[in-house]
């Protein structure tokens, strides 16, 4: 298997894992799932209503379906600070995510 096809297979695997986790989060607690993923209700409805076949087809894209929510270097660096306790890092992360705009269908 070439390096390119191996990388595409890994992207597909990550995509499928992401979509399945997203669906599970949304089915268990829609509001919390939307918050954790930073997505709009419209996008949440699309994700939760995908059939298994649609989910697998979407995961087979050659592009990553998930992305970093923090585009700011300073923000990401502060979240990765090793000097903080786990509880403080989780609280700080939740506060920062709450201030980020949600993704919507374009």
Swiss-Prot record:
GO terms for molecular function: DNA binding. One of its GO terms (cellular component) is cytoplasm. One of its GO terms (biological process) is bacterial-type flagellum assembly. Its main location: cytoplasm. It holds the Pfam family FlhD. Keywords: Activator, Bacterial flagellum biogenesis, Cytoplasm, Disulfide bond, DNA-binding, Transcription, Transcription regulation. The keyword Transcription applies. The C-terminal region contains a putative helix-turn-helix (HTH) motif, suggesting that this region may bind DNA. HAMAP family: FlhD. Functions in complex with FlhC as a master transcriptional regulator that regulates transcription of several flagellar and non-flagellar operons by binding to their promoter region. Activates expression of class 2 flagellar genes, including fliA, which is a flagellum-specific sigma factor that turns on the class 3 genes. Also regulates genes whose products function in a variety of physiological pathways. This is Flagellar transcriptional regulator FlhD. The lineage of its organism: Bacteria, Pseudomonadati, Pseudomonadota, Betaproteobacteria, Burkholderiales.
């Amino acid at each position: 298997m070439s390096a390119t096809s191996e990388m595409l297979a890994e992207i597909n695997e990550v995509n499928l894992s992401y979509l399945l986790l997203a669906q599970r989060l949304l089915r268990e607690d829609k509001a919390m799932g939307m918050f954790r993923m930073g997505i709009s209700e419209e996008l949440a409805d699309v994700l939760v209503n995908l059939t298994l076949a649609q989910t697998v087809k979407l995961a087979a894209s050659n592009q990553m379906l998930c992305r970093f929510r923090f585009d700011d270097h300073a923000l990401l660096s502060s979240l990765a600070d090793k000097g903080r306790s786990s509880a403080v890092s989780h609280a700080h992360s939740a506060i920062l995510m709450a201030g980020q705009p949600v993704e919507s269908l374009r």
